[in-house]
From Swiss-Prot:
Enzyme class: lyase
Keyword Protein biosynthesis: no
Descriptive protein name: S-adenosylmethionine decarboxylase proenzyme
SUPFAM superfamilies: S-adenosylmethionine decarboxylase
Name of the gene encoding the protein in the UniProt record: speH
Cofactor: binding details: Binds 1 pyruvoyl group covalently per subunit.
Pfam families documented for this protein: AdoMet_dc
Tagged with keyword S-adenosyl-L-methionine: yes
Positions bearing the site annotation: Cleavage (non-hydrolytic): E62, S63
């Protein structure tokens, strides 16, 4: 079925505390992830929480990438939504690698053209 976009939702566990708590590192990682997927970056907004955690969004011409990090749990929730021919898994894989995620669960949701059919996203295999 033809869709308007692909939305990958990643649950990242066992991530490095310092990386999850470093707003500049996360911002750079997300911009690089967007560029590696072939996206055109439009806007970038990130916020550092006290005592820890980062939330942010990279708006791309093709949609968006978001993160909410919980360093105290080694956890990050990631969304990568792309329209057109871009593969959101390219960006999601890069982010998981950069955050050194030990465990990753993904789902991919086709958006905008009919009933939602949730499927496991094809995540790049990672050695633990």
């Amino acid at each position: 079925m033809e869709t308007m976009g692909r939305h990958v939702i990643s649950e990242l566990w066992g991530c490095d505390f310092d990386k999850l708590n470093d707003m500049d590192f996360i911002e750079k990682t997300f911009v690089n992830a967007a560029l590696k997927s072939g996206a055109e970056v439009r806007e970038v907004a990130f916020h550092k929480f006290a005592p820890q955690g980062v939330s942010g969004v990279v708006i791309i011409s093709e949609s968006h990438l978001t993160i909410h990090s919980f360093p105290e749990h080694g956890y990050a929730s990631i969304d990568v939504y792309t329209c057109g021919d871009l593969d959101p898994n390219v960006a999601a894989d890069y982010i998981a690698e950069e955050l050194r995620a030990e465990t990753r669960e993904n789902i991919e949701i086709p958006r905008g053209m009919g009933p939602v059919q949730v499927k496991q996203a094809k995540a790049k295999a990672q050695a633990l």
